[in-house]
Amino acid sequence: MKQNLIVMFLLISFGSQAQGFLTSKNIKIDFSGFVRNDFIFDSRKNVCACDHLLEFFPYEPVYDENGEDIYAQPNAHFLNTFSRFGTRFSGLELGKATVSGYIEVDFTGYSPTNGIRLRHAYTSFVWPKTTLLFGRAWHPTFIEKVYPSVLNENTGLPFQVFNRSPQLRLTHHLAKNLDFIAGAVYQFNYANDGPDGKTYRYQREAVVPNLHAQLQFFNENWVAGAAVDWKSILPRNATAGTNGTFKTTEKLNTWAALAYLKYTKNKFEFKAKSMYGQNVNESLLPGGYAVASLDASTGTETYTPLNHMYNWVNFTYGQTWKFGFFAGYLKNLGTSENPIGPFYGMATDIDMVYKISPQLIYTYKNFMFGWEMSWTTAAYGDIDYTNFGKIKNAENVTNFRNMLSVAYNF
Protein backbone atom coordinates (compact mmCIF):
# COMPACT_ATOMS: atom_id res chain seq x y z
CA MET A 1 0.00 0.00 0.00
CA LYS A 2 2.82 2.39 0.90
CA GLN A 3 4.55 1.61 -2.41
CA ASN A 4 1.37 2.42 -4.36
CA LEU A 5 0.99 5.75 -2.53
CA ILE A 6 4.63 6.64 -3.25
CA VAL A 7 4.24 5.80 -6.95
CA MET A 8 1.01 7.84 -7.15
CA PHE A 9 2.71 10.82 -5.45
CA LEU A 10 5.63 10.66 -7.89
CA LEU A 11 3.32 10.51 -10.92
CA ILE A 12 1.27 13.48 -9.70
CA SER A 13 4.46 15.44 -9.00
CA PHE A 14 5.86 14.62 -12.45
CA GLY A 15 2.57 15.56 -14.13
CA SER A 16 2.45 18.94 -12.42
CA GLN A 17 6.07 19.63 -13.38
CA ALA A 18 5.44 18.52 -16.99
CA GLN A 19 2.55 20.97 -17.31
CA GLY A 20 5.01 23.72 -16.47
CA PHE A 21 7.46 22.58 -19.18
CA LEU A 22 4.91 21.76 -21.89
CA THR A 23 3.76 24.86 -23.79
CA SER A 24 1.55 25.40 -26.80
CA LYS A 25 2.75 27.56 -29.70
CA ASN A 26 0.85 27.77 -32.98
CA ILE A 27 -0.82 24.36 -32.90
CA LYS A 28 -1.00 23.01 -36.47
CA ILE A 29 -2.65 20.02 -38.09
CA ASP A 30 -1.42 19.19 -41.60
CA PHE A 31 -2.97 16.59 -43.88
CA SER A 32 -1.17 14.71 -46.64
CA GLY A 33 -1.59 11.67 -48.83
CA PHE A 34 -2.67 10.60 -52.28
CA VAL A 35 -5.41 8.84 -54.21
CA ARG A 36 -3.86 6.18 -56.42
CA ASN A 37 -5.05 3.54 -58.87
CA ASP A 38 -2.84 0.79 -60.28
CA PHE A 39 -3.33 -1.59 -63.19
CA ILE A 40 -1.03 -4.62 -62.98
CA PHE A 41 -0.38 -7.46 -65.41
CA ASP A 42 1.73 -10.48 -64.36
CA SER A 43 2.86 -13.24 -66.70
CA ARG A 44 2.55 -15.84 -63.89
CA LYS A 45 1.46 -16.16 -60.26
CA ASN A 46 3.77 -14.71 -57.62
CA VAL A 47 4.53 -14.74 -53.93
CA CYS A 48 3.02 -11.40 -52.94
CA ALA A 49 1.22 -9.40 -50.26
CA CYS A 50 -1.47 -6.71 -50.02
CA ASP A 51 -3.62 -8.22 -52.78
CA HIS A 52 -0.74 -8.45 -55.29
CA LEU A 53 0.52 -4.88 -54.73
CA LEU A 54 3.72 -6.09 -53.05
CA GLU A 55 5.37 -8.49 -55.49
CA PHE A 56 8.27 -10.57 -54.15
CA PHE A 57 9.19 -13.26 -56.70
CA PRO A 58 7.44 -15.90 -58.83
CA TYR A 59 6.06 -19.09 -57.30
CA GLU A 60 8.06 -22.28 -57.67
CA PRO A 61 6.64 -24.29 -60.61
CA VAL A 62 4.13 -27.03 -59.80
CA TYR A 63 3.51 -29.42 -62.70
CA ASP A 64 0.33 -31.30 -63.55
CA GLU A 65 0.06 -34.77 -65.11
CA ASN A 66 0.72 -33.26 -68.56
CA GLY A 67 3.90 -31.55 -67.40
CA GLU A 68 2.35 -28.08 -67.48
CA ASP A 69 3.19 -25.54 -64.79
CA ILE A 70 0.00 -24.74 -62.85
CA TYR A 71 1.42 -21.37 -61.75
CA ALA A 72 2.28 -20.28 -65.31
CA GLN A 73 -1.01 -18.43 -65.38
CA PRO A 74 -1.16 -14.78 -66.49
CA ASN A 75 -3.30 -12.54 -64.29
CA ALA A 76 -4.35 -8.90 -64.10
CA HIS A 77 -5.41 -6.59 -61.26
CA PHE A 78 -6.97 -3.12 -60.98
CA LEU A 79 -6.38 -1.81 -57.46
CA ASN A 80 -6.79 1.41 -55.47
CA THR A 81 -5.92 0.15 -51.99
CA PHE A 82 -2.52 1.89 -51.96
CA SER A 83 -4.26 5.26 -51.54
CA ARG A 84 -2.93 6.88 -48.39
CA PHE A 85 -3.86 9.46 -45.75
CA GLY A 86 -1.58 11.03 -43.14
CA THR A 87 -1.95 13.66 -40.42
CA ARG A 88 0.83 15.57 -38.65
CA PHE A 89 0.26 17.42 -35.38
CA SER A 90 2.75 20.09 -34.29
CA GLY A 91 3.04 23.22 -32.17
CA LEU A 92 3.94 21.89 -28.72
CA GLU A 93 7.20 22.53 -26.90
CA LEU A 94 8.65 20.57 -23.99
CA GLY A 95 11.49 22.61 -22.57
CA LYS A 96 13.81 23.24 -25.53
CA ALA A 97 12.30 20.43 -27.60
CA THR A 98 9.59 20.82 -30.23
CA VAL A 99 7.02 18.03 -30.07
CA SER A 100 5.09 16.61 -33.02
CA GLY A 101 3.05 13.54 -33.82
CA TYR A 102 2.31 11.72 -37.06
CA ILE A 103 -0.20 9.03 -38.01
CA GLU A 104 -0.66 7.47 -41.45
CA VAL A 105 -2.95 4.79 -42.87
CA ASP A 106 -3.66 3.11 -46.17
CA PHE A 107 -6.26 0.57 -47.29
CA THR A 108 -4.17 -2.58 -47.69
CA GLY A 109 -5.36 -4.18 -44.45
CA TYR A 110 -6.06 -7.90 -44.15
CA SER A 111 -9.62 -7.77 -45.45
CA PRO A 112 -11.40 -8.47 -48.73
CA THR A 113 -13.14 -5.10 -48.29
CA ASN A 114 -10.02 -2.87 -48.29
CA GLY A 115 -9.46 -2.73 -44.54
CA ILE A 116 -7.56 0.21 -43.07
CA ARG A 117 -3.93 -0.57 -42.18
CA LEU A 118 -1.84 1.50 -39.79
CA ARG A 119 1.47 2.47 -41.41
CA HIS A 120 3.02 5.03 -39.06
CA ALA A 121 2.12 6.28 -35.58
CA TYR A 122 4.86 8.10 -33.70
CA THR A 123 5.76 11.12 -31.59
CA SER A 124 8.99 13.08 -32.16
CA PHE A 125 10.93 15.28 -29.75
CA VAL A 126 13.37 17.56 -31.58
CA TRP A 127 16.18 19.44 -29.84
CA PRO A 128 18.81 21.54 -31.67
CA LYS A 129 21.16 18.55 -32.08
CA THR A 130 19.06 15.53 -31.11
CA THR A 131 15.82 13.93 -32.24
CA LEU A 132 14.00 11.24 -30.27
CA LEU A 133 11.24 9.21 -31.94
CA PHE A 134 8.74 7.01 -30.06
CA GLY A 135 6.36 4.76 -31.96
CA ARG A 136 5.73 2.85 -35.16
CA ALA A 137 7.92 3.93 -38.07
CA TRP A 138 10.25 2.50 -40.70
CA HIS A 139 12.82 0.11 -39.24
CA PRO A 140 16.22 1.87 -39.00
CA THR A 141 17.65 -0.52 -41.63
CA PHE A 142 15.14 0.83 -44.18
CA ILE A 143 17.20 4.09 -44.50
CA GLU A 144 14.63 6.81 -45.11
CA LYS A 145 17.13 9.02 -47.01
CA VAL A 146 18.21 6.20 -49.35
CA TYR A 147 15.57 3.80 -50.65
CA PRO A 148 14.59 2.82 -54.20
CA SER A 149 12.60 5.29 -56.30
CA VAL A 150 10.30 2.80 -58.01
CA LEU A 151 6.67 2.88 -59.05
CA ASN A 152 5.94 -0.55 -57.60
CA GLU A 153 4.60 -0.39 -54.05
CA ASN A 154 7.09 -3.03 -52.90
CA THR A 155 9.79 -0.30 -52.64
CA GLY A 156 12.52 -2.63 -53.89
CA LEU A 157 11.46 -5.96 -52.35
CA PRO A 158 12.92 -8.55 -51.96
CA PHE A 159 16.27 -6.71 -51.96
CA GLN A 160 15.33 -3.77 -49.74
CA VAL A 161 14.06 -3.85 -46.15
CA PHE A 162 10.28 -3.37 -45.81
CA ASN A 163 9.40 -3.16 -42.12
CA ARG A 164 7.52 -0.68 -39.93
CA SER A 165 7.73 -1.51 -36.23
CA PRO A 166 7.37 0.04 -32.75
CA GLN A 167 10.68 1.58 -31.74
CA LEU A 168 12.66 4.13 -29.79
CA ARG A 169 15.07 5.87 -32.18
CA LEU A 170 17.65 8.54 -31.38
CA THR A 171 19.36 10.70 -34.00
CA HIS A 172 22.22 12.91 -32.79
CA HIS A 173 24.20 15.43 -34.86
CA LEU A 174 27.85 14.62 -34.16
CA ALA A 175 29.02 17.29 -36.59
CA LYS A 176 27.61 19.56 -39.29
CA ASN A 177 27.30 16.71 -41.82
CA LEU A 178 27.42 13.63 -39.62
CA ASP A 179 24.63 11.89 -37.67
CA PHE A 180 24.70 9.00 -35.22
CA ILE A 181 21.50 6.94 -35.18
CA ALA A 182 20.60 4.38 -32.52
CA GLY A 183 17.44 2.32 -32.26
CA ALA A 184 15.66 -0.23 -30.07
CA VAL A 185 12.91 -2.05 -31.96
CA TYR A 186 10.20 -4.55 -31.02
CA GLN A 187 8.36 -6.66 -33.59
CA PHE A 188 4.62 -6.44 -34.20
CA ASN A 189 3.01 -7.52 -37.47
CA TYR A 190 6.42 -7.59 -39.20
CA ALA A 191 7.67 -10.64 -37.33
CA ASN A 192 9.96 -13.65 -37.61
CA ASP A 193 8.79 -17.10 -38.61
CA GLY A 194 9.19 -20.10 -36.31
CA PRO A 195 7.65 -23.27 -34.86
CA ASP A 196 4.34 -21.45 -34.21
CA GLY A 197 4.27 -19.65 -37.56
CA LYS A 198 4.90 -15.93 -38.00
CA THR A 199 4.55 -14.15 -34.65
CA TYR A 200 6.24 -11.43 -32.61
CA ARG A 201 6.27 -13.78 -29.60
CA TYR A 202 9.74 -15.11 -30.42
CA GLN A 203 11.37 -11.71 -30.05
CA ARG A 204 9.25 -10.42 -27.18
CA GLU A 205 9.91 -13.52 -25.08
CA ALA A 206 13.63 -12.99 -25.69
CA VAL A 207 12.93 -9.66 -23.90
CA VAL A 208 15.86 -7.65 -25.31
CA PRO A 209 14.87 -5.38 -28.22
CA ASN A 210 16.36 -5.45 -31.70
CA LEU A 211 19.33 -3.04 -31.33
CA HIS A 212 20.66 -0.79 -34.09
CA ALA A 213 23.58 1.62 -34.55
CA GLN A 214 24.33 3.73 -37.62
CA LEU A 215 26.59 6.53 -38.87
CA GLN A 216 25.29 8.74 -41.68
CA PHE A 217 27.17 11.42 -43.64
CA PHE A 218 25.28 13.92 -45.77
CA ASN A 219 25.75 17.17 -47.67
CA GLU A 220 24.16 18.92 -50.63
CA ASN A 221 24.97 16.13 -53.12
CA TRP A 222 25.83 13.04 -51.08
CA VAL A 223 24.35 10.72 -48.48
CA ALA A 224 26.44 7.78 -47.29
CA GLY A 225 26.34 5.55 -44.27
CA ALA A 226 26.89 2.22 -42.58
CA ALA A 227 25.00 0.36 -39.87
CA VAL A 228 24.96 -2.77 -37.73
CA ASP A 229 21.85 -4.47 -36.37
CA TRP A 230 21.52 -7.16 -33.68
CA LYS A 231 18.52 -9.28 -32.72
CA SER A 232 17.70 -12.15 -30.36
CA ILE A 233 14.71 -14.50 -30.57
CA LEU A 234 13.43 -17.38 -28.43
CA PRO A 235 11.89 -19.89 -30.90
CA ARG A 236 10.51 -22.16 -28.16
CA ASN A 237 9.84 -21.77 -24.44
CA ALA A 238 9.32 -25.51 -23.91
CA THR A 239 10.40 -28.72 -25.63
CA ALA A 240 9.27 -32.34 -25.47
CA GLY A 241 11.54 -35.38 -25.63
CA THR A 242 11.58 -39.02 -24.61
CA ASN A 243 12.09 -38.03 -20.96
CA GLY A 244 9.17 -35.57 -20.89
CA THR A 245 8.53 -31.86 -21.33
CA PHE A 246 11.11 -29.25 -20.31
CA LYS A 247 11.39 -25.49 -20.21
CA THR A 248 14.02 -24.11 -22.61
CA THR A 249 15.83 -20.79 -22.90
CA GLU A 250 17.77 -21.56 -26.10
CA LYS A 251 17.92 -18.36 -28.16
CA LEU A 252 19.13 -17.44 -31.63
CA ASN A 253 21.24 -14.27 -31.81
CA THR A 254 21.80 -12.79 -35.27
CA TRP A 255 23.45 -9.82 -36.98
CA ALA A 256 23.00 -7.64 -40.02
CA ALA A 257 25.40 -5.08 -41.49
CA LEU A 258 24.80 -2.65 -44.32
CA ALA A 259 26.27 0.23 -46.32
CA TYR A 260 24.52 2.70 -48.61
CA LEU A 261 25.12 5.67 -50.91
CA LYS A 262 23.14 8.38 -52.69
CA TYR A 263 24.38 11.01 -55.14
CA THR A 264 22.16 13.83 -56.42
CA LYS A 265 23.09 16.43 -59.04
CA ASN A 266 20.51 18.58 -60.82
CA LYS A 267 18.02 16.14 -62.42
CA PHE A 268 20.15 13.03 -61.83
CA GLU A 269 19.97 10.78 -58.78
CA PHE A 270 21.89 7.57 -58.06
CA LYS A 271 21.37 5.24 -55.07
CA ALA A 272 22.85 1.92 -53.98
CA LYS A 273 22.72 -0.31 -50.93
CA SER A 274 24.23 -3.62 -49.86
CA MET A 275 23.25 -5.61 -46.76
CA TYR A 276 24.46 -8.83 -45.19
CA GLY A 277 21.72 -10.28 -43.02
CA GLN A 278 21.00 -13.28 -40.80
CA ASN A 279 17.36 -14.28 -40.25
CA VAL A 280 15.89 -10.97 -41.45
CA ASN A 281 12.66 -12.40 -42.83
CA GLU A 282 10.67 -10.10 -40.50
CA SER A 283 11.58 -7.37 -43.03
CA LEU A 284 9.88 -9.34 -45.86
CA LEU A 285 13.25 -10.57 -47.14
CA PRO A 286 14.19 -14.17 -47.98
CA GLY A 287 15.88 -15.66 -44.93
CA GLY A 288 15.33 -17.55 -41.73
CA TYR A 289 17.00 -20.23 -39.66
CA ALA A 290 17.11 -23.98 -39.10
CA VAL A 291 17.48 -26.47 -36.29
CA ALA A 292 21.19 -27.32 -35.95
CA SER A 293 21.03 -29.97 -33.24
CA LEU A 294 18.43 -31.89 -31.23
CA ASP A 295 18.63 -33.66 -27.87
CA ALA A 296 16.13 -36.51 -28.23
CA SER A 297 15.77 -37.01 -24.48
CA THR A 298 14.71 -33.43 -23.69
CA GLY A 299 13.73 -32.11 -27.13
CA THR A 300 16.19 -29.22 -26.66
CA GLU A 301 17.19 -27.60 -29.96
CA THR A 302 19.98 -25.30 -31.08
CA TYR A 303 19.60 -23.08 -34.13
CA THR A 304 21.67 -21.80 -37.02
CA PRO A 305 20.75 -18.76 -39.15
CA LEU A 306 20.56 -18.48 -42.91
CA ASN A 307 22.98 -15.87 -44.27
CA HIS A 308 22.04 -13.69 -47.24
CA MET A 309 23.45 -10.81 -49.27
CA TYR A 310 20.94 -8.23 -50.53
CA ASN A 311 22.04 -5.66 -53.14
CA TRP A 312 20.35 -3.03 -55.27
CA VAL A 313 21.17 -0.01 -57.45
CA ASN A 314 18.78 2.65 -58.72
CA PHE A 315 19.02 5.81 -60.79
CA THR A 316 16.54 8.38 -62.06
CA TYR A 317 16.88 11.31 -64.45
CA GLY A 318 14.42 14.06 -65.20
CA GLN A 319 11.84 16.28 -63.57
CA THR A 320 8.47 16.56 -65.30
CA TRP A 321 9.30 13.48 -67.35
CA LYS A 322 11.47 11.15 -65.28
CA PHE A 323 13.17 7.97 -66.46
CA GLY A 324 14.37 5.46 -63.89
CA PHE A 325 16.05 2.09 -63.65
CA PHE A 326 16.27 -0.38 -60.76
CA ALA A 327 18.30 -3.58 -60.48
CA GLY A 328 18.49 -5.94 -57.51
CA TYR A 329 20.29 -9.17 -56.68
CA LEU A 330 20.21 -11.39 -53.58
CA LYS A 331 22.14 -14.54 -52.79
CA ASN A 332 21.52 -17.32 -50.26
CA LEU A 333 24.91 -18.03 -48.64
CA GLY A 334 23.67 -20.96 -46.57
CA THR A 335 23.59 -21.51 -42.81
CA SER A 336 26.37 -20.84 -40.31
CA GLU A 337 26.37 -24.52 -39.23
CA ASN A 338 25.19 -27.65 -40.98
CA PRO A 339 21.43 -27.90 -40.35
CA ILE A 340 19.36 -30.96 -39.55
CA GLY A 341 16.05 -29.16 -40.14
CA PRO A 342 13.36 -28.09 -40.12
CA PHE A 343 13.85 -24.62 -41.65
CA TYR A 344 11.77 -21.62 -40.58
CA GLY A 345 11.55 -18.47 -42.65
CA MET A 346 10.84 -17.15 -46.11
CA ALA A 347 12.08 -18.66 -49.39
CA THR A 348 14.58 -20.94 -47.65
CA ASP A 349 14.79 -23.07 -50.84
CA ILE A 350 15.71 -20.15 -53.13
CA ASP A 351 19.36 -19.78 -54.18
CA MET A 352 19.17 -16.31 -55.70
CA VAL A 353 16.76 -13.69 -57.02
CA TYR A 354 17.41 -10.87 -59.48
CA LYS A 355 15.26 -8.10 -60.88
CA ILE A 356 15.65 -5.46 -63.60
CA SER A 357 13.05 -2.73 -63.85
CA PRO A 358 12.83 0.41 -66.05
CA GLN A 359 10.20 3.10 -65.46
CA LEU A 360 8.85 6.30 -66.98
CA ILE A 361 6.91 8.79 -64.84
CA TYR A 362 5.18 12.04 -65.75
CA THR A 363 4.33 14.54 -63.01
CA TYR A 364 2.54 17.88 -63.21
CA LYS A 365 1.93 19.69 -59.92
CA ASN A 366 -0.10 17.18 -57.84
CA PHE A 367 -0.76 14.74 -60.68
CA MET A 368 1.32 11.64 -61.51
CA PHE A 369 1.10 9.09 -64.31
CA GLY A 370 3.62 6.27 -64.48
CA TRP A 371 4.61 3.09 -66.29
CA GLU A 372 6.96 0.43 -64.97
CA MET A 373 8.08 -2.95 -66.26
CA SER A 374 9.91 -5.50 -64.12
CA TRP A 375 11.60 -8.79 -64.90
CA THR A 376 12.02 -10.94 -61.76
CA THR A 377 13.80 -14.31 -61.74
CA ALA A 378 14.12 -16.69 -58.77
CA ALA A 379 16.21 -19.88 -58.66
CA TYR A 380 14.46 -22.67 -56.71
CA GLY A 381 16.32 -25.82 -55.70
CA ASP A 382 16.97 -28.45 -53.05
CA ILE A 383 18.45 -27.73 -49.62
CA ASP A 384 21.81 -29.49 -49.16
CA TYR A 385 21.91 -30.52 -45.50
CA THR A 386 25.54 -31.67 -45.85
CA ASN A 387 26.77 -28.31 -47.19
CA PHE A 388 25.48 -25.68 -44.75
CA GLY A 389 21.97 -25.61 -46.16
CA LYS A 390 23.06 -24.20 -49.51
CA ILE A 391 20.84 -24.72 -52.54
CA LYS A 392 21.67 -27.30 -55.20
CA ASN A 393 19.96 -28.27 -58.48
CA ALA A 394 18.53 -24.75 -58.80
CA GLU A 395 16.26 -23.88 -61.71
CA ASN A 396 15.14 -20.40 -62.73
CA VAL A 397 11.55 -19.21 -62.96
CA THR A 398 10.62 -15.72 -64.19
CA ASN A 399 7.72 -13.28 -63.91
CA PHE A 400 7.20 -10.33 -66.22
CA ARG A 401 5.16 -7.48 -64.68
CA ASN A 402 3.73 -4.43 -66.43
CA MET A 403 2.24 -1.67 -64.32
CA LEU A 404 0.36 1.58 -64.99
CA SER A 405 -0.38 4.02 -62.16
CA VAL A 406 -2.36 7.24 -61.82
CA ALA A 407 -2.18 9.29 -58.63
CA TYR A 408 -3.28 12.65 -57.25
CA ASN A 409 -1.25 13.93 -54.28
CA PHE A 410 -2.51 16.29 -51.61
Labelled PLM ranges:
Residues 1-20:
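Bacterial Sec-dependent N-terminal signal peptides
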Residues 20-53, 61-190, 207, 212-223, ...:
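Outer membrane beta-barrel
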Residues 25, 72-80, 113-115, 160-162, ...:
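Short sequence motifs at beta-strands and strand-loop junctions characteristic
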Residues 42-46, 112-114, 143-147, 189-194, ...:
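Outer-membrane beta-barrel proteins
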Residues 70-73, 108, 151-156, 192-201, ...:
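Extracellular loop and loop/strand-boundary signature of outer-membrane beta-barrel proteins
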Residues 219-350, 354:
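Detector for outer-membrane/organellar transmembrane beta-barrel domains
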Residues 366, 374-389:
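C-terminal beta-signal and adjacent terminal beta-strands/loops
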Residues 394-410:
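Outer-membrane beta-barrel "beta-signal"
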